[in-house]
């Protein structure tokens, strides 16, 4: 997967994960996904980080243990794009401060990144601003507040 402009040195990247079978589109249920593609994203570009691949029986079977390695693989991500996600999977993703986003239909990963990048250039929605702060230390200087 391509780089999209040089990596900025001062800006902190936001990591975004995509549930995918074929590594091109978001078309997979989180629990059944064979792959989770991870990208870093800035307002002026993005880059591919890595693909986490999963083997074995990934079909719906009520076995929640198969979610643990997936959660571990994306724990540094702020956003997870999926075609679908079960209730317990969504709860575990949210508990790890990852915002799940369900796409209405299969959508190319690079198209989603382009759209998300444009949103970051403007005024992102509150949920996205919060997601962008994942992994950043929150410092409050009470002396500056009046």
Swiss-Prot record:
GO terms (BP aspect): nitrogen fixation
UniProt entry tagged with the keyword Lyase: no
InterPro entries registered for this protein in UniProt: Di-Nase_FeMo-co_biosynth (IPR003731), DiNase_FeMo-co_biosyn_sf (IPR036105), NifX (IPR013480), NifX-like (IPR034169), NifX/NifY_domain (IPR051840)
Record GO terms (molecular function): metal cluster binding
Key words of the record: Nitrogen fixation
Upper classification of the organism: Bacteria, Pseudomonadati, Pseudomonadota, Betaproteobacteria, Burkholderiales
Record Pfam families: Nitro_FeMo-Co (PF02579)
Entries under SUPFAM superfamilies matching the protein: Nitrogenase accessory factor-like (SSF53146)
Gene name for this UniProt entry: nifX
Family the UniProt entry places it in: Belongs to the NifX/NifY family.
Name assigned to this protein: Protein NifX
């Amino acid at each position: 997967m391509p780089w999209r402009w040089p990596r900025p040195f001062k800006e902190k990247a936001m990591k975004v994960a995509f549930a995918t079978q074929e590594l091109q589109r978001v078309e997979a249920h989180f629990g059944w996904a064979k792959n989770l593609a991870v990208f870093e994203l800035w307002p002026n570009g993005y880059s591919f980080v890595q693909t986490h691949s999963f083997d074995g029986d990934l079909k719906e079977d009520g076995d929640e243990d198969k979610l643990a390695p997936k959660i571990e693989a994306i724990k540094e991500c702020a956003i997870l794009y999926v075609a679908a996600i079960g209730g317990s999977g969504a709860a575990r993703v949210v508990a790890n401060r990852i915002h799940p986003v369900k796409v209405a239909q299969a959508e190319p990963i690079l198209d989603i990144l382009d759209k998300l990048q444009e949103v970051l250039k403007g005024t992102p929605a509150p949920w996205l601003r919060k997601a962008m702060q994942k992994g950043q230390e929150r410092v409050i200087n009470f002396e500056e507040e009046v």
